[in-house]
């Protein structure tokens, strides 16, 4: 029973830790236009996009390396 509880807990932690990687890529309405990276599930990779500087979400990384690090379980 304890093993089952630990297994379920581990699965929930993993899925919660990468859930932001599954959020849509949101450029935002502002016009700062900075290069950012986001995980794109349809291609299972991090891709570059232009972020406007406001109203984005947590699927928004300053570098490809950061994106790949945080979303590596989905690659």
Swiss-Prot record:
Q: Which GO terms describe its molecular function?
A: calcium channel regulator activity; potassium channel regulator activity; serine-type endopeptidase inhibitor activity; toxin activity
Q: Which domain of life is it from?
A: Eukaryota
Q: What is this protein called?
A: Kunitz-type serine protease inhibitor As-fr-19
Task: Name its cellular compartments.
Answer: Secreted
**Domain BPTI/Kunitz inhibitor: residue ranges:** 21-71
Q: What family does this belong to?
A: Belongs to the venom Kunitz-type family.
Q: What lineage is this protein's organism placed in?
A: Eukaryota, Metazoa, Ecdysozoa, Arthropoda, Hexapoda
* Position of the signal peptide: 1-17
Cysteines joined through disulfide linkages: 21-71, 30-54, 46-67
| Family matches, as SUPFAM superfamilies | BPTI-like
Q: What does this protein do?
A: May exert inhibitory effects on serine proteases and on potassium and/or calcium channels and then participate in the long-term non-lethal paralysis on the prey.
- InterPro entries reported for this sequence: Kunitz_BPTI, Kunitz_BPTI_sf, Prtase_inh_Kunz-CS, TFPI/VKTCI-like
Please tell me in which tissues this protein is expressed.
Answer: Expressed by the venom gland.
Keywords assigned: Calcium channel impairing toxin, Disulfide bond, Ion channel impairing toxin, Neurotoxin, Potassium channel impairing toxin, Protease inhibitor, Secreted, Serine protease inhibitor, Signal, Toxin
Tell me the CDD domains matching this sequence: Kunitz-type (cd00109)
Which organism does this sequence originate in? Anoplius samariensis
**Which SMART domains does the entry mention?**
KU
Its predominant location is secreted
Under the cellular component aspect of Gene Ontology, which terms does the record hold?
A: extracellular region
């Amino acid at each position: 029973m304890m093993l089952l509880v630990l297994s379920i807990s581990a699965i929930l932690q993993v899925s919660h830790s990468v859930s932001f990687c599954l959020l849509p890529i949101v450029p935002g309405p502002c016009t700062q236009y900075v290069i950012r990276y986001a995980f794109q599930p349809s291609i299972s990779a991090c891709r570059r996009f232009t972020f406007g500087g406001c109203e984005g979400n947590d699927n928004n990384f300053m570098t490809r390396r950061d994106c790949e690090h945080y979303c590596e379980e989905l690659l």
